[in-house]
C-alpha cells in the first residue's frame, strides 16, 4: 500500500499529493508517469510524475478532479493509502545537451512542464518557461516555476494575471526576437500542443510534446494509447510519452481522446448519486 504523505489544494479542483513510493522514486526521471488505483475495484489511471525525492522515497502527483476516479482520489486524506502505484513507466525525457530551451505549459500541463524546466535549469541550461492559464484563479506552482527557469512568462486568457495572450504568441515573439532554441518542449491540452508545433514548424525548431492519451495497462498490450507519429503507429506508454511534435497526428489523437466522454460523464453521475444516497442514509 502506498501512503499519502501530503495533500495540498492548488486551486478549486486541482490537488497535489506526495506518495510514499521508494521504489518508484529511486528510478523516476522527468517525463515518466505512474499508473495508480485508488482501490481494488477502481480503474487504473495514468498520471505524469510532477516531482520526486529519492532520499525521502516519495513521488509527487498533481491532478484535476474531473472524473469519478480523480474525484475518489481527491477525497482521500493524508495517511490514507492507494491500492496500486506502479512506475516509473514510459521513457524519460531526453534533455542532455540542450543549452537553450523554451518550455511551454498549458493549464494542468504546467505540473509536468515544471519538472522538465527544473531538470534543465539544474543542468545549466537557459530556460524560458511560458505558462498559460484561463484565469488567475487556476494558476498553479507559480513560485516553483520561477525557481526552475531563467525567465518565466505567465499569460492568461482574460488578462487577470500576467499578460492577456496565448502561449503561442509569446513563443513566436521570443523566437522572432532572436532567441535560438535548441528545442521547444510543449505540455498541455492537445490543441495547445498542436498550435505550438505549428508555430515552431516554419523555424525548423525541434519541438517535443508529451502525449497524455487513453491508457489502461501502461505496457503497450491494451493498445488504448496508440497514436500516429510520422505515419506509423506508436504507443504512448512504451514509445513515449514524449514525441517529435512535428510528426504527431494531433487530429486523430484528439478524436481518440474523446471516445469515452459519454462513459466518463455516466461514471461521474453514478458517483454523485452514490454520494447523495450515502448522505441520506447517515442522517
Please place each PLM-identified region on the residue numbering:
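Short Fe-S-cluster ligation motifs
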Residues: 235-239, 243-283
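A generic structural signal for residues embedded in beta-strands
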Residues: 36, 84-85, 227
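Local cysteine-cluster metal-coordination motifs and their immediate loop/turn environment
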Residues: 112, 190-191, 212-242, 273-277
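Ferredoxin-reductase
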Residues: 1-80
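Short, Lys/Arg- and Gly-enriched loop/turn segments at beta-strand edges
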Residues: 42-51, 89-99, 237
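FNR/FR-type flavoprotein reductase catalytic core
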Residues: 71-216
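Structural signal for conserved beta-strand scaffold positions within catalytic alpha/beta enzyme cores
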Residues: 6, 51, 154-156, 209, ...
Amino acid at each position: 500500500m502506498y501512503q499519502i504523505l501530503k495533500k495540498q489544494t492548488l486551486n478549486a479542483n486541482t490537488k497535489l499529493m506526495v506518495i510514499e513510493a521508494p521504489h518508484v522514486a529511486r528510478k523516476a526521471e522527468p517525463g515518466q508517469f505512474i499508473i495508480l488505483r485508488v482501490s481494488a475495484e477502481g480503474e487504473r489511471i495514468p498520471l505524469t510524475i510532477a516531482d520526486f525525492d529519492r532520499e525521502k522515497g516519495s513521488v509527487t502527483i498533481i491532478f484535476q478532479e474531473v472524473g469519478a476516479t480523480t474525484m475518489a482520489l481527491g477525497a482521500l486524506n493524508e495517511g490514507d493509502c492507494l491500492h496500486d502505484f506502479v512506475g516509473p513507466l514510459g521513457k524519460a525525457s531526453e534533455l542532455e545537451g540542450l543549452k537553450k530551451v523554451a518550455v511551454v505549459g498549458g493549464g494542468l500541463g504546467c505540473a509536468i512542464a515544471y519538472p522538465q524546466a527544473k531538470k534543465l535549469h539544474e543542468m545549466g541550461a537557459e530556460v524560458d518557461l511560458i505558462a498559460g492559464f484561463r484565469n488567475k484563479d487556476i494558476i498553479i506552482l507559480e513560485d516553483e516555476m520561477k525557481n526552475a527557469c531563467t525567465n518565466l512568462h505567465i499569460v492568461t486568457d482574460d488578462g487577470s494575471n500576467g499578460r492577456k495572450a496565448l502561449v503561442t504568441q509569446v513563443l513566436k515573439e521570443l523566437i522572432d526576437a532572436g532567441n535560438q532554441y535548441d528545442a521547444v518542449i510543449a505540455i498541455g491540452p492537445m490543441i495547445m500542443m498542436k498550435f505550438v508545433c505549428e508555430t515552431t514548424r516554419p523555424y525548423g525548431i525541434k519541438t517535443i510534446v508529451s502525449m497524455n492519451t487513453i491508457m489502461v495497462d501502461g505496457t503497450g498490450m491494451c493498445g488504448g494509447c496508440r497514436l500516429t507519429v510520422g505515419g506509423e503507429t506508436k504507443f504512448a506508454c512504451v514509445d513515449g510519452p514524449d514525441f517529435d511534435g512535428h510528426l504527431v497526428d494531433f487530429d486523430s489523437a484528439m478524436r481518440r481522446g474523446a471516445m469515452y466522454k459519454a462513459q466518463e460523464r455516466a461514471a461521474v453521475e453514478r458517483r454523485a448519486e452514490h454520494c447523495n444516497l450515502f448522505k441520506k442514509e447517515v442522517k
